[in-house]
Amino acid sequence: MAVSVTPIRDTKWLTLEVCREFQRGTCSRPDTECKFAHPSKSCQVENGRVIACFDSLKGRCSRENCKYLHPPPHLKTQLEINGRNNLIQQKNMAMLAQQMQLANAMMPGAPLQPVPMFSVAPSLATNASAAFNPYLGPVSPSLVPAEILPTAPMLVTGNPGVPVPAAAAAAAQKLMRTDRLEVCREYQRGNCNRGENDCRFAHPADSTMIDTNDNTVTVCMDYIKGRCSREKCKYFHPPAHLQAKIKAAQYQVNQAAAAQAAATAAAMTQSAVKSLKRPLEATFDLGIPQAVLPPLPKRPALEKTNGATAVFNTGIFQYQQALANMQLQQHTAFLPPVPMVHGATPATVSAATTSATSVPFAATATANQIPIISAEHLTSHKYVTQM
């Protein structure tokens, strides 16, 4: 069964979530600062989401009343990143399909093995904010569509029989979040002797920033990049030493993700190449045990490409001689001089006990030697045995 991937235009990476406060008319942020979309009246909104105009990203939209969103610069940058990731994902799927098709063509009887998928995020199909939030990185759990992902967070390991519980998945997701800092508990009690610039934990000025579930605050990434222009930002602005800590954590996560992606690609390529190759052994092809006949020795390299100075290889001659000996041994048979005949008549026994001198190749046989009877003699002289 051939595996093929049909290129389908996917608009999910162009989808943005519409600001609910903007729909109510209460959003205080302009469209150039809000992390959600502020569509115009001509835009088509479905289920609180809007599709961005692809021509607008390329700067070539000439429609007067375009039904697609023309995103502001900060959302346009995020959409371009999502588009590149989507293109890389499609290329990986096409490459994987070609490898599976080639392996299946070389081994028709072998079933296609499923590719292990690793998912460390909740279901994108049920979490709209995670699926369409432009400030969250485009997390690609695997090559599986979002509609068939599990509804509960789950880590799928290489062994499908051993799933990781949701608590471990949440812990892994927490470790991957590099935009959060733990709040100093001593600062919350008013007992922290270290200042804001010396403490390794966050000292937020506003208690509404603190997430009560894990006692953390979300860091303003725009402030770290030096471009936060909000008068009253709801995210934490960390001091210099905590900014360095966040940048180091982001660097480690990116390096680990790149190393894991390279290792996965190398393992897939190596497994595909290994499955298409096998060592050529003459003893395996002839059905002869390895101990009986040694493998064919390698031919020494020639001095010239035309083979004019080829040297006689004694290994080839020994190999051919061993094959000839094996064929001679298979065509010969051994028979006792006096066959055991149960319940035979005297005439039959006398016919069976023929003199050994009448047997070909046994004229010089002594009483202690077993005569060798050829296969042609066995076919021409039939011995009758009664059971």
UniProtKB/Swiss-Prot annotation:
Keywords assigned by UniProt?
A: Cytoplasm, Metal-binding, Nucleus, Phosphoprotein, Repeat, Zinc, Zinc-finger
Please provide, in alphabetical order, the Gene Ontology terms of the cellular component aspect for this entry: cytoplasm; cytoplasmic stress granule; nucleoplasm; nucleus
Any idea where this protein resides? Answer: Nucleus; Cytoplasm; Cytoplasmic granule
- Keyword Acetylation tagged: no
Q: Where are the zinc fingers (C3H1-type)?
A: 13-41, 47-73, 178-206, 214-240
Example GO biological process term? embryonic limb morphogenesis
- In terms of domain of life, where is this protein from? Eukaryota
InterPro entries named in the record: Znf-CCCH_Muscleblind-like (IPR054429), Znf_CCCH (IPR000571)
Q: Which Pfam families match?
A: zf-CCCH (PF00642), zf-CCCH_10 (PF22628), zf-CCCH_2 (PF14608)
On this chain, the residues bearing Phosphothreonine are T6
Query: What Gene Ontology molecular function terms does this protein carry?
Result: double-stranded RNA binding; regulatory region RNA binding; RNA binding; zinc ion binding
Fetch the SMART domains from UniProt: ZnF_C3H1
Assembly, per entry: Interacts with DDX1 and YBX1. Interacts with HNRNPH1; the interaction in RNA-independent. Interacts with RBPMS; the interaction allows cooperative assembly of RNA-bound stable cell-specific alternative splicing regulatory complexes.
> What family does this belong to?
Belongs to the muscleblind family.
Q: What does this protein do?
A: Mediates pre-mRNA alternative splicing regulation. Acts either as activator or repressor of splicing on specific pre-mRNA targets. Inhibits cardiac troponin-T (TNNT2) pre-mRNA exon inclusion but induces insulin receptor (IR) pre-mRNA exon inclusion in muscle. Antagonizes the alternative splicing activity pattern of CELF proteins. Regulates the TNNT2 exon 5 skipping through competition with U2AF2. Inhibits the formation of the spliceosome A complex on intron 4 of TNNT2 pre-mRNA. Binds to the stem-loop structure within the polypyrimidine tract of TNNT2 intron 4 during spliceosome assembly.
Q: What is this protein called?
A: Muscleblind-like protein 1
Which organism does this record belong to? Rattus norvegicus
